[in-house]
Amino acid sequence: VQVISSYDQFKQVTGGDKVVVIDFWATWCGPCKMIGPVFEKISDTPAGDKVGFYKVDVDEQSQIAQEVGIRAMPTFVFFKNGQKIDTVVGADPSKLQAAITQHSA
């Protein structure tokens, strides 16, 4: 899982033809801390080889969070070819796993 630390990096990461999932989180968000390790664990599964895993701190990268329309944390957003293709809102491991499985197929 890589941290996105600039808007340019965000555009580069989301613009490719590989599906990427970005965890939009905040340091002060309890549920984010709870699901963070789950996100890391899923990235180490076979699905993780087919999907790029990234994190964005919404406080450090407010421009990205605003452009994507993040209103709650954590929010997991899937991108392919520069387009948002799916969103999972909240710290729900089974929903997150299901979406990652679906997009890695």
Curated annotation (Swiss-Prot):
Disulfide bonds join 29-32. Residues 1-105 form the Thioredoxin domain. The record marks 30-31 as: Contributes to redox potential value. The record marks 23 as: Deprotonates C-terminal active site Cys. InterPro entries: Thioredoxin, Thioredoxin-like_sf, Thioredoxin_CS, Thioredoxin_domain. It comes from the Eukaryota. One of its GO terms (molecular function) is protein-disulfide reductase activity. Keywords: Allergen, Disulfide bond, Redox-active center. Gene3D superfamilies: Glutaredoxin. The active site is at residues 29, 32. NCBIfam families: thioredoxin. Participates in various redox reactions through the reversible oxidation of its active center dithiol to a disulfide and catalyzes dithiol-disulfide exchange reactions. Monomer. Belongs to the thioredoxin family. This is Thioredoxin.
